[in-house]
Amino acid sequence: MLELSNYFIIDSTDNKPRKDLENLELTNRGIIFKSLPDDNHKMVASTFPYTEEFGINNIVEIENLMIKNEYSFYKSYEGTIIRVIHDEQEGVIKRLVATHKKLDAFESYWGSYVSYGELFQNEIYSMFLKHNPDSELSNDKVFELFLDSLDTSLHYTFLLTSNDENKIVSSLNNKIFFAGSFDRETNKYNPPETTNSSQLFPFDIPEQINFKTSQDIIDYIEKVDYKESQGILAIQKDEFKLFKVINDEYSRKTLLRGNNSSLIHRYLQLKFIGDDQMFFEFMDLFNYKIQLFQQIESDIQNLALYIHSVYYARYIEKTFVYVNPVFHSVLKSIHYWHNMDKRKNITTLKVVYQKLQETDYNTVYKLMKEYKKLCEEGKILL
């Protein structure tokens, strides 16, 4: 693998980290540079450009996709691009496995405790075992075999589809599609149907679709199953531009999770802002997480019980009890309410639970994390 200390990555969605790159036009995702002596740098890899997205109501854009037959169309899937980048280091061609945002895909996480690099490697191992069920090679050895099978004159791109943990809307459970390669020297893109991914590891490629008219595109997008696909990806052949036409229902359901990597945090957010329709649609989209949602409700109840017990000890029994500052602010708020009318405003467990419901969801999320930590440390026995 490449020694990463001499490399850095700039993504079009991020700020430029270096003054010498202030004038760089960031049209592509995850541009990888190598630092050279005297504060110089060299671009190592620039793969896919930023992808513009629009729906079927944008008739003008859809009609433009049909002009002069400049585009190739593919079924679009939700997922993350994994890149195998090759570069010369100390006279030897070495590689790195990266995402668009991270030089090391094994350090890239979203919505899961398993990194994108691990997910990618594990799926390759599963693919290998399907064709070689009697193999005794280890996971790491198979991954090394896969990397060694790649042409070092190319950079490779793969789409690792979402799974039930990191999906926004749709999931194909870590299925890998070969998304094409780039020439190391010229950066010319080779579509997946025109180049081999690996002789030893044959990957599927995204389904290519032929459209004759813009209405064909609209008809197709309207019938897309949002649980499987986003819509279509259009790649312009000459200028190498990417566009996605997204199914309306898929687009609407992206709002349910939003860009929130934590399902627990998003659950609390939707619950506490009081949008019942969105909240129940979120639970329906992630209905296989019902045990998690039930646990969240149980944790809120236990949290209320803990806060009430601390309140009783501190303010009724006048016993010193140390609590984390985030708990202190809630206790102080409850006691302020009590002092407004001491005879009427009695701090019961039900009141504490209601006060939690009125608290900002970010604060409740912090309280739950701190409460769980205290439980794990054996400092709370409930």
Segments (PLM) and residue ranges:
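Core nucleotide-handling region used for phosphoryl-transfer chemistry
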Residues: 1-382
